[in-house]
Every structure is written in structure tokens, then in C-alpha cells.
Amino acid sequence: MSSFEYPQDLRYLDTHEYVRLDGEIATIGITEFAVDQLGDVVFLELPDIGDLLTKGDTFGTIESVKAVEDLNAPITGTVVERNEILIESPDAVADDPYGEGWFLKVRVNDPDEVNDALTADEYRAEVEGE
């Protein structure tokens, strides 16, 4: 059994990003599983405030001592906030990936898009099969 958390109020991509929808604002980050797989994160590239994300497209990169990975948008919308703490100290994502370790806040175009992402149980089945 996995020791990773998969909060039920989030939706997930099989590429290990999550989205939390609160009204028309979506919070985007990466999962605890992804943080574990990456190891020590050393660099994070995120879009600027005002940039448009398109669901399924790459919006940034995360670099660790093990790998460089693309970050994929789970939803379409405009970036309204980015976590500047992670820009300065990208390794802070490991401390609280579902809380203080979020990457972006996005004003969504269509909140129903979130339903295309995996539920916590579906995501758990994906990662435990890896």
C-alpha cells in the first residue's frame, strides 16, 4: 500500500500534476508521488501572470538532480498568481506539495474541464501500477 497522499478534493493528470478548483480559480501543482520520484528540486520555470494556459499543453519545467520534466496544464485559463517562494527556493515544493507548494493560480475558462482529469482513486490506481 502506498504511503503517499492523494487528497479527494483534487483532480490529477497521469503526468502527476494536480488541480484544485475553488469557484473560477484553479490551483495547480505536482503530486507528492511526483516530488518523491524527482528527488531534490533545483529549478522551476513557470509562466508569467497574465499568460494563458491551454489544457494539455506544457506550461513550464521542473528540474531536479535526477531529471528535467515538463509541466502540463490540467485546465485552460489565465495565470493570476504564481508561487514566488518556489521560484526562489524550488525545493520547498517537497515540504507541502498540496498546500504551500502549489505552482500557479489560474482563472479558468471552463470549470467543467476539471472533470476530464482523474479522481484521487483513479490517480492512485495509475501510480500504484507504475
Swiss-Prot record:
Keywords: Lipoyl. GO terms for biological process: glycine decarboxylation via glycine cleavage system. Its cofactor is (R)-lipoate. The keyword Transferase does not apply. It comes from Trichormus variabilis (strain ATCC 29413 / PCC 7937). HAMAP family: GcvH (MF_00272). This is Glycine cleavage system H protein. One of its GO terms (cellular component) is glycine cleavage complex. The glycine cleavage system catalyzes the degradation of glycine. The H protein shuttles the methylamine group of glycine from the P protein to the T protein. The keyword rRNA processing does not apply.
